Amino acid sequence: MRARRLLILLMMLLLLPQAQAERLTLYTRPNNVDEATPFQLRPTELSICSVTRAMGGVVVLANDYNYDSLSLYFWQDGMTEMRKLGGGFYWVMSSDTMETAQQSCEYSMSRVPNYRMPDLTHAISELTSDGETLYALNRMNGLIFKISETADGLQTEDVCTMENLSCLNVSYRDLETDKVYTYPASLTRMHVCGSVLAISVMQENGFKVVLVDLTDGTIREIADESLEAMYEWADGELLLWRLEGSTNEISRSSGTYTLSRYSVATGEETLLSTGVPYKERSECGAYDPYSDSYYDVRIRQIVRTTDFVQEEPVVTFPAANVNIAVTKDSIVGVNLTSVYVRSKEYGDMTVLRIQSSNG
């Protein structure tokens, strides 16, 4: 009898890690979906693109494989699953043009049942918000537009068109031929700062920040080789990470960094920290307007700070380097395949589901 009890206890212990692992999963993209299964009967297959604080909660932008288009999902504190706001947006790849996008949509029409041709004028390259209202950028035509939920579904409202699109490119010189090549750059982050849209644009060395005036589409830039990252802050300000000293690849991984607040309105910078080691440099972060603090991602650990000198470990996520957004009570983290929610106060994982919806 005692041996049997020990055997049962051992089996329970073996099963415990699996149960805990399942509890840590908010959404995971299913694997090995049978291609013969009709699209409307397949499980929801999403590739998570981004998360942003908006509409009193957070909005997750995801590419829905079943419908070959972008969908928006909403979650706020107290909800037990994410609600689909709508979909049907075209996801702009960095090399897309209106012509190639049209060809891609025509191909989707030939393979996806009930595929609806998207509005390519309002295709989405990046999505962000001012904390409440959603803003999207279409890099194919430079259009910046708002997205809002109405009784009739999601509606778009044009804001402005960028005065030129060359600022979203990157150039490099071939040392052997001395030729200069230009191609579309990766856009790593986007934030609304008052009447300005700030876009972080990857360059051959480091980054630059493109500032678009939302009233008329005019552009100015923050550009120098030491600039390494841009994150959101309060009251029309950005956080800028800069590399101290040489900008070669060795110093990027072993050097030190400065952190400053940048006023979009005045161009003034306020130095916050110097000599920050590479391992303590932010991988991703989010401003918390509810506590006037900043949450910083350090691989799997989330730390909170108010002065960028002292830090308080808050929670951990099961995946590394998630992108995060905050609500009043929670931190929401996403990567390519998953969505997680942690309580700010207790650090517990909330298991949610994404509502399925046709179309």
Where are these regions (language model features)?
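Short loop/turn segments that connect beta-strands within beta-propeller blades
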Residues: 75-79, 148-152, 213-217, 263-267, ...
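Structural motif
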Residues: 66-73, 141-147, 205-210, 247-260, ...
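Surface-exposed loop and turn segments in beta-propeller and other repeat-based domains
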Residues: 27-41, 85-118, 158-181, 273-279, ...
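Hydrophobic core
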Residues: 11-16
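Blade-level signature of beta-propeller repeat domains, shared across WD40, Kelch, NHL, RCC1
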Residues: 333-359
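An edge-strand/N-cap motif at the start of beta-rich repeat modules
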Residues: 21-65, 72-74, 78-80
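Short beta-strand elements that form the blades of beta-propeller/WD-repeat-like
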Residues: 49-64, 90, 98-103, 125-128, ...
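Repeated scaffold domains used in trafficking and secretory/extracellular systems
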Residues: 45-54, 90-97, 121-128, 167-171, ...
